Amino acid sequence: MHKNSAPRILIMLLLAFSMSFSAAFAEGGPAGEQPSQEQTAQAPAEQPDAGVIRIKGKYCYRDPLTKKLRKKAGFVRWNGELYYVQDGGAIQTGKEFRVGKHRYRAFKDGRIATGVYRWKKKLYYSDPKNGRWQTVGSYRLQRGVKWKGNWYFLQTNSEVAANRPVVIKDLPYYADSKGVCTRLEIRKTKNPVLKVARKQIGKRTKKDVQGFWTWFFGRSFVDTDATPWCGTFVGWCYRKAGQYDKIRASGNIAYVPSISRFADNRGKWVRKAKARDGDIIVFGNNRHVGIVERVYKGYIFTIEGNAGPDAEVGTRKPGAVARMVYKLDDRGIKGVIRP
C-alpha cells in the first residue's frame, strides 16, 4: 500500500459518517424510523386540551381557562356553536330534549340546531340565538320567519313548510323543497265581491269591524268572542259589491248554519276543486265562513273576516281581515258555496 493511502481512506470514512448523520438528523431520528403511535396520539390537533372534546366516545366540555371538565348542567358556546352539558359532564347528542319549558334538538356531534335545518328528513326552525323550538300553536298562529335573507313559513312544532303555498303578512308565497318562500303574483279578478274583499285585508281595529257588523245588526260591535263577525263580513262584501240579492235568501247572514241551509235548499254547493273567485267557503261544523280567492296547486286561498292570529279561540280580540290558505282536502273545510 502507498504510504499516503491510509490518511485518504480515513478522511473518506469520516465524510461518509458525517453525511449519514446529517440525513438522520433531518428525518428527526435514525434513518428510516417512523413516528410511534404514542407520538401521533399526543399531537394537539388530535387531542384538543380545551373546549368541546371527546373522551371515551363521549363529547365533553373543558374550560379553556381552568382546563377543568364541566360537570354542571347548562349551555356552553364554543367556536360559534351552542352545546348543552348534562349533569355529570356529557354533552347532549343526537336527540330532542327539554330544559325547563323549552325544547331543543342536538345533532350527533352535540351542536344545538339553530336557524333552518333538516331533522329526520323534515325542515325545522329554532331560534338562531338560543336554539329554542319556535312552537306557534294552531294553524291560525302560523307565521313567516326571515333567516339569512330568505323567508320561511313556520308551522306547528317548529316545522318549516315545503312544496306548498303559504301566506306571510297577508301576501301569498310558495315554499320550495328547501322551504325558501317566493312571492306569488296576486292574480287580477273581475269578480266584484273579491275586489271588495281584497281592499279590506289587514283591517283589524274595533272601528274597522263596526262597519262590517252594524250594517246588518244596527247596533255596536262588542269586542269579544261572543260576537264573531266572519258572516257579517261576507255579507258586507256582497252588499258593497252590489251582489247581496244572491245571498239575501240565506236570512241571518251572521249565522253560518243559515248560509249552509241556504246552500242545501237551493243546491248551491260546488266541489272544492272547482271553486271560483268570490265563492263562499264554509269551515268545520258551520263554525266559520270566508270568501274564496283562488285555487292553486291543490290549495285554496281565501279572504276571511275574524281571522288571523288575534282570532284564536279563547282570545278577547276581534281578529282581522286576513288572507289564508288551506289544502283542498283539509278536513276543516266543510265545502264551497256558489250563490
Region roles according to the model:
Residues R204-K207, A241-A249, K297-F301, P309-V313:
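Substrate-binding/catalytic groove segments of enzymes
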Residues S5-I11, L15-T189:
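Extracellular adhesion/carbohydrate-binding repeat motifs centered on closely spaced tryptophans
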Residues W269-V270, N285-P339:
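Aromatic- and glycine-rich peptidoglycan recognition patches
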Residues A263-R271:
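Short alpha-helix capping/helix-loop boundary micro-motifs
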Residues A241-A263, E293-R294:
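Short, basic/aromatic beta-hairpin or loop at an interaction surface
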Residues R276-I280:
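Structural motif
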Residues E185-Q243:
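N-terminal capping segments
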Residues A26-A45, V167-Q210, A273, Y299, ...:
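Intrinsically disordered, low-complexity
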